[in-house]
A protein has these predicted regions:
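A short, basic N-terminal segment
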Residues: 1-35, 53, 57-82
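C-terminal alpha-helical "lid" subdomain
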Residues: 2-14, 25, 48, 81-82, ...
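Short glycine-/polar-rich loops that comprise or flank the Walker A/P-loop
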Residues: 34, 79-83, 158-160, 181-186
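Hydrophobic anchor at the beta1->P-loop junction of P-loop NTPases
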Residues: 39
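Walker A (P-loop) phosphate-binding loop of P-loop NTPases
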Residues: 44
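Switch/connector loops and helix/strand junctions flanking conserved nucleotide-binding motifs
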Residues: 47-48, 94-95, 170-175, 196-199
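Sensor-1/coupling segment of RecA-like P-loop NTPase cores
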Residues: 154-178, 188-191
């Protein structure tokens, strides 16, 4: 389990699941072939967390310039980072979404070029936006028609892999925009945790939170059965339930 600090989450350590493994393969394919991919799933199944863990994106990179020396901390961040993560704002015009994307792709490119010890500052500035291999847009359901056109234009211009994350049905909405839909190469449905997988990972989660699960104790087994039944594989519900357990 790897540390992934996200405000508001009780489960600070990321637990690799089968669904994350499938998401990783899907995202890597979008990078390798420079396609647009759609990731859809019910609320709370872990789409956003999977995207954050896959990219290892850190907002500290935003604002990085070509002049100042790259700090050791940011060099470690960019070495582990596989792309930019953008959460579509509730109010999004083409200008807003363009700014949100380019700020991050530029920061990624500048940081990567400096980490690779590129001596030519002009080259760093001019080529920075083209160095980002992947852009993931979370809450893509919020994007307006014009904002989607802007995203498509940036995708064509900079040739990064693109993943759009949203709710079930987002693919039907995109199908109404032929210019965007024709560029979609992959689709992935992010599903809930299976019951078997929940029973496998829960003891690990408990251990990480400083709790002990003993399968020989009836009360522990009964507690596990109750959690499985109540949460039904929804990661957000699992996180909330464990936050209540810790509080008590």
């Amino acid at each position: 389990m790897n540390e992934l600090h996200m405000p508001g989450r009780t489960l600070r350590s990321f637990v690799p699941t089968q669904e994350f493994g499938k998401f990783r393969e899907f995202a890597n394919s979008c990078v390798d072939f420079r396609y647009i991919g759609i990731c859809l799933g019910e609320p709370g199944v872990g789409k956003s967390l999977a995207a954050a863990h896959f990219t290892q994106w850190c907002e500290e990179l935003v604002g990085e310039n070509a002049i100042d020396e790259l700090s050791a901390k940011k060099e470690r961040i960019i070495r582990n980072c596989s792309g930019a993560l953008v959460t579509a704002p509730v109010t999004n015009t083409p200008k807003i979404i363009r700014t949100e994307i380019l700020r991050r792709t530029h920061a990624y490119g500048v940081a990567l070029a400096k980490a690779n010890r590129e001596p030519d500052v002009c080259k760093v500035v001019l080529e920075a936006k083209g160095l980002c291999p992947l852009v993931i847009i979370d809450e893509a359901d919020r994007l307006t028609i014009n904002a989607l056109e802007e995203v498509r234009s940036l995708y064509d211009q900079y040739q990064f892999g693109l993943v759009l994350i949203g709710m079930p049905g987002i693919e039907k909405r995109f199908a109404r925009y032929p210019q965007l839909y024709s560029r979609i190469g992959f689709s992935h449905e992010f599903k809930r945790l299976s019951e078997d997988e929940m029973r496998f990972i829960f003891p690990k989660i408990w251990s990480n939170l400083g709790l002990t699960y003993n399968p020989d104790y009836f009360s522990d087994v009964e507690a596990l059965n109750t959690i499985v039944r109540i949460t039904a594989g929804n990661f957000r519900l699992i996180d909330r339930l464990f936050s209540q357990i810790i509080r008590n």
